[in-house]
């Protein structure tokens, strides 16, 4: 029985790897200065710009969306007008750590 729990613990840690990655909210605040232009100072969003509320959103979701915008998975289709606005904004984040940092900051907003 103990061996079974040990194996399950190891498997759990293997899949938790990306979730264990941490961003630095204080650094993310610097990146967020550009984000707040559309999403607002507190991440509440802006209906006029079709910028959704991001405060209170799950970190994994924010991370995935930013990575998809950076990679061109989102915002590349001609009909995705708002995505085309967001894609170059995500491109300003220089690397994966910057994505984690801005996500950490957004998660600090309530």
Map each language-model feature to its residues:
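Charged catalytic carboxylate motif
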Residues: 27, 61, 98-101
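Sequence context surrounding c-type heme c attachment/ligation sites in exported
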Residues: 29-33, 56-59, 63
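Bacterial N-terminal signal peptides that target proteins for export
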Residues: 1-8
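Axial heme c-ligation environment in periplasmic c-type cytochrome domains
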Residues: 47-55, 70-101, 106-110
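N-terminal signal peptide c-region/cleavage motif recognized by signal peptidases
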Residues: 16-18
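Sequence/structural segment immediately N-terminal to covalent heme-attachment motifs in c-type
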Residues: 22-44
